[in-house]
Regions:
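Proline- and acidic/polar-enriched loop/turn elements at helix boundaries
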Residues: 46, 82-83
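His-Asp-centered catalytic microenvironments across diverse enzyme cores
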Residues: 3, 7-22, 39, 83-215
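Secondary-structure boundary elements
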Residues: 1-57
Length: 215
């Protein structure tokens, strides 16, 4: 699949200017640069330039800045997506004990990525890919670059609330959110199946900053 691309033009906005200052002049190079940045908590996720200032970011901030770059250059076809997928023990063996403890087959987790036309792209880390979680995708919605904080959490929690009701899961929202946090803790403990050097396509795995994504 050929990578979607466009030129970054001067005078279009703050994100474009940041990339040009780094001698990055097209979307392909910009997305490669973003994927290569460290996965880390951002000090202010409401600041669209935070990935440059912090020299890293999460799945939210990394894809938000690419969406903003596209908008600045008249490329509205680059959409920012929020997906909810089944996080199960097949995907992440390290959470099996917690899922078994609470008698759950999986727990719905959130992730950000891009959709361009009929193709999906994940620039969370080098080698990240949509196909790694596509088969487990439960829901997705388009959001804007300035909706990755409160709106993302609200969407995720509302999805969980409906899931609990529809699937007749015997937990309330706060209890299932606590189980989710335990799963996240499990993901930060390297196992033989998931060595510490393995890069997951989903933003949270093996990332010590992950719990701050929802703080």
């Amino acid at each position: 699949m050929e990578m979607y691309n466009f030129m970054i033009n001067e005078g279009k906005g703050p994100v474009s200017e940041k990339f040009i200052a780094l001698n990055i002049h097209d979307f392909d190079a910009a997305s490669t640069f973003i994927a290569g940045l460290s996965y880390k908590r951002n000090q202010d996720k409401n600041n669209i330039l935070c990935v440059f200032e912090d020299k890293g970011g999460t799945c939210s901030t990394k894809h938000a800045v690419l969406r903003k770059l596209a908008l600045e250059n008249g490329q509205d076809s680059v959409k920012l997506m929020l997906g909810i997928f089944k996080m199960d023990s097949k995907y992440a063996p390290s959470i099996k004990k917690t899922l078994d403890q609470y008698r759950l087959a999986y727990i719905p987790e959130a992730h950000n990525y891009l959709k361009i036309g009929n193709h999906y792209y994940d620039f969370t880390k080098p080698g990240s890919g949509y196909n790694d979680f596509k088969s487990n995708l439960l829901s997705e919605t388009e959001i804007e670059h300035d909706q990755i904080t409160l709106e993302k959490i609200t969407f995720h929690r509302e999805f969980l609330r409906n899931w609990l009701d529809n699937e007749r899961i015997g937990y309330n929202l706060e209890e299932i959110w606590s189980v989710r946090e335990k799963c996240i803790e499990d993901l930060q403990k390297p196992t033989k199946e998931e060595p510490e050097t393995n890069f997951s396509p989903v933003c949270f795995q093996n990332s010590p900053e992950v719990r701050d994504e929802y703080k």
